[in-house]
Every structure is written in C-alpha cells, then in structure tokens.
Amino acid sequence: MKNKPTCYDVRGEIPEIYSGVPTFLGLPKVTEEEIDGHDVIVMGAPWEGICTTGSYTGCELGTKTIRSASIRYGGYLPEFDYDAFDYISAGDFGDAAHFPGDSAATFDSIEKKADAIFSRNKRSLCFGGDHSITIPMLRSLAKNFPGKRIGVVHFDAHLDNMPSFHDTEPLARCCPMHRA
C-alpha cells in the first residue's frame, strides 16, 4: 500500500499530530526533513484573530476538527473508480505555531511553515483558522515563486476585501483579499 494513508488498513494504527488528534486522512506525519518524499503536504493554521462578528467562533479549532472528521475518508472516489493516492504521495506537516493576540507573530509562523513546503516546490493544502491565514500563505507563495502568477480561487459569502477593520487592524479576517 505504498503512498496509501493508514485509513485504507482497518487494522492500521492512525498516526497523530498530537495526542488525540489524527493526521489528515491518516496520512503519515512528516517532519521538515521528510517533505521531499511527498508531492502534497498538509499543514494547519489554527488561528482566530481579531473578532469581527460580535463573538469568537472557534476558528482556531478548525485544524483539529477537520483532521478528526477526515479520518473517515480516503482518496478513493467510487463513482469514478479513481484513487488519488495511486498518483500522489502526501504527508501531514502539523500545525504552525500560533500566538493568541499577536497577528504578526502568528502570521510569521504560518509563513515560515509554508516556506518549508514551497521552497521545495511542493504543493500544499492548508486549513485553519480564520480567513486571514490567506495572507501569510500568499506571502510565502510570492516569495518562493518570484515572477510567477499566483491565482486565488475565493469561495465565500462575502469578498473579505476591506483595507482594515475599523481603520485599526489590517490583518483581520475581513481583509485578506484586499492584500491578495
């Protein structure tokens, strides 16, 4: 079962990112040194920044929740008799460190973790976190692929294109597309 996540083996032990939290789809947990052995690297950005909705929403719990839910799935699409893991190898690189109340330090952490992936010309799947995690991911892409066009496909109920939140917070969740 080369390149297959452990969820394909019903008797397999599911790797964990940290205690009680499985890797995405049961993929192997990878260190920075192991990134080169994979085509796609998953990373998390568990961040909830400036609250713009009246109360906090739990965005920082997204990485745990997505990973926990993903363990029920794999890469096989029965409608097409297609298994993505016949063609790619993927690993879970864990979460970027986050610093509650400090957008700049958190974004720096996310960008550095993304740099470890993109500097090796690997593809990434990043989940978080509130909308603002888009900013450090795009910064890393731009830095690691200079002169290349970077496209953003944005699915949301609103555009997230405010220049700042109440003229004080340019890194709020309502602002990433303004910087894209």
Question: For the regions a protein language model found, what residue spans apply to each?
Answer:
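Conserved alpha-helical scaffold segments that buttress catalytic/binding sites
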Residues: 2-180
